[in-house]
A protein has these predicted regions:
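Glycine-rich phosphate-binding loops that contact phosphosugars or nucleotide phosphates
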Residues: 45-174
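Cofactor-/ligand-binding subdomain signature composed of acidic, glycine-rich
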Residues: 1-47, 165-174
């Protein structure tokens, strides 16, 4: 039988695994990527594209769905979200040789994401990757066209990307 007496906080209520100083440093490091992200998007914008696809598997797919909903409600840019395994199985007729696939991987070695990158390149599309772990398969030159290498803060990186695409499209007054 479980009772409430079996569980007591040693130091009162607290957030487990929350380390304020480390988390602030990590977020500030991700925010410092803004200029690099903007340079990449400027290049993508200048080269031209027809669609933006946020593609992921697992938690990255969840992050991709959030940013797609965010953009869809605020932008006229053609933005889509795909589950990597489904894309590999069924494809998407909207994805062309002028499309951009934006993805993220913590390990840099996720099988579905590796196969996805190969499929995108086979179609002729471009890959903009956020990879957390250096010296992995997805950091190799043939596995991405644009690379940001920085751990954690996937959603922040995706939202900075979305916001700058919308800024380039004249969808922010400031």
């Amino acid at each position: 039988m479980i009772t409430t007496e079996l569980w007591k906080e040693n130091e009162g209520a607290n957030l487990r695994n929350f380390h304020e100083e480390q988390d602030l440093k990590s977020v500030n490091g991700a925010l410092a990527l803004r200029k690099d992200i903007e340079k990449i998007i400027d290049k993508i914008w200048d080269e031209g594209f027809d669609n933006i696809f946020y593609i992921g598997i697992g938690g990255t797919y969840a992050s991709a769905m959030q940013v797609e909903v965010y953009m869809r409600g605020r932008s006229k840019l053609p933005v889509y979200v795909e589950n990597a395994a489904e894309f590999l199985t069924t494809g998407n007729k909207r994805f062309t040789n002028k499309s951009i696939a934006i993805l993220s991987s913590v390990s840099g070695n996720t099988l579905e994401m590796i196969e996805l990158v190969d499929k995108v390149h086979e179609i002729g599309g471009k890959v903009f990757s956020f990879i957390d772990t250096p010296n992995t398969v997805l950091t190799q030159p043939d596995k991405q066209d644009y690379l940001i290498l920085y751990p954690k803060n996937e959603q922040l990186k995706f939202y900075m990307t979305a916001n700058y695409f919308m800024f380039k499209n004249g969808e922010f007054a400031e």
